[in-house]
């Protein structure tokens, strides 16, 4: 009974604060300037024409809640349990301080409806044609023949294919016999796997695959001839772990991309067992290790793909701390899903190759700006798009 009382109290307090908060001082802005200003508070501002009118309208209630305006009949906390509501309120993902007046909110919606297209009709396939991969031949392999199998990981390491399913199974596949064998079993799905040079194995267990504010993820290490050991628990939907000796002290640091949902982070578990927060926002998909500024210290580069979509570098300082810097930022509709950092043009500088195409959100439609991009480094850490394939 106490749990239910607390649940309804939290809902009441949230709705009270978001609807009865202090109103912002009104500033007279043109509709275009108002859109550009308010839609750039949390991320790169999109343009109105990136979505059709009906999808903007569908997104208004959520957008309003983010700005502190609660539209009639909309509860952004619907479907969450008590712990999730606690986490969202504490994070202030939905601001308690209204950042637009009711009049400005109406002005924003009218501007979007007047200027958004009825449909996005400029979707065209790229004209660039690629040569056939004549050096390769496809070979079908049998991984998901069992009813209800959902593959959550494919990892090819040391001539062995490892894969995992939604139900916590972790398997190896033998190419010669075309047979799979169960390697380990976990409570929930494994979504990332890494073998270290010393033979240790790192397993990233997501917890709950569907969007949630519950922190159910875990990080495991399997050392040779030892029982599997839990490194960390209560992780927020972790999807990737980079396990490397970043400061060259002989010990491994684990950099964890906690994608999360409304909240999330990039965290790092150091060799002494402490956990450091590198990035306080959701959407981290993966982290790589590079010497970005060529100072001899290994830095981190991460892809963040939720809200404030960006590629962020974490420059290692001499004291071992990491300083975040944006390398690239994208509007929140770009659907960033992967990146690689390579010297693509052979000039000695690391360039960026990004894939944009995640479309599983409230604004599902074919989007002409989804595709593969190559952004070249000018040598000073500035990146400019040089190639786009749709």
How would you label these PLM feature ranges?
Residues 1-30:
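Bacterial Sec-dependent N-terminal signal peptides
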Residues 21-29, 37-390:
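Beta-propeller-forming repeat regions
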């Amino acid at each position: 009974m106490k749990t239910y009382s607390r649940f309804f109290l939290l809902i009441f307090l949230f709705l009270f604060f978001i609807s009865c908060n202090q109103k912002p001082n009104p500033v007279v802005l043109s509709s275009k300037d108002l859109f550009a200003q308010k839609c750039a508070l949390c991320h790169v501002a999109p343009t109105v024409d990136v979505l059709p009118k009906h999808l903007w309208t569908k997104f208004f209630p959520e957008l309003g809640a983010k700005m502190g305006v609660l539209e009639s009949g909309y509860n952004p906390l619907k479907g969450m349990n008590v712990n999730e509501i606690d986490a969202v309120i504490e994070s202030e993902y939905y601001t308690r301080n209204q950042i637009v007046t009711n009049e400005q909110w109406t002005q924003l919606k009218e501007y979007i409806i007047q200027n958004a297209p009825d449909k996005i009709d400029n979707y065209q396939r790229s004209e660039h044609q690629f040569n056939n991969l004549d050096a390769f031949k496809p070979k079908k392999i049998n991984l998901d023949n069992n009813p209800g199998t959902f593959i959550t990981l494919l990892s090819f390491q040391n001539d062995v294919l490892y894969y995992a399913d939604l139900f916590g199974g972790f398997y190896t596949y033998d190419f010669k016999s075309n047979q799979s064998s169960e390697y380990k079993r976990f409570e929930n799905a494994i979504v990332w796997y890494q073998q270290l040079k010393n033979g240790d194995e790192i397993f990233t267990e997501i917890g709950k695959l569907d969007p949630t504010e519950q922190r159910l993820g875990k990080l495991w290490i399997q050392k040779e001839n030892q029982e599997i050991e839990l490194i960390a628990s209560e992780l927020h939907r972790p999807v990737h772990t980079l396990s490397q000796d970043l400061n060259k002290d002989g010990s491994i640091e684990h950099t964890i991309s906690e994608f999360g949902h409304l909240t999330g982070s990039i965290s790092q578990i150091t060799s002494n067992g402490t956990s450091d927060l590198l990035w306080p926002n959701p959407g981290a998909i993966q982290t790589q290790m590079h010497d970005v500024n060529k100072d001899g210290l290994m830095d981190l580069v991460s892809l963040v793909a939720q809200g404030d979509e960006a590629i962020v570098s974490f420059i290692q300082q001499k004291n071992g701390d990491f300083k975040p810097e944006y390398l690239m930022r994208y509007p929140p509709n770009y659907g960033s899903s992967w990146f690689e950092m390579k010297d693509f043009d052979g000039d000695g500088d690391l360039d960026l190759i990004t894939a944009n195409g995640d479309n599983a959100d409230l604004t599902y439609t074919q989007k002409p700006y989804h595709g593969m991009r190559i952004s070249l480094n000018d040598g000073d850490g500035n990146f400019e798009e040089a190639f786009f394939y749709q």
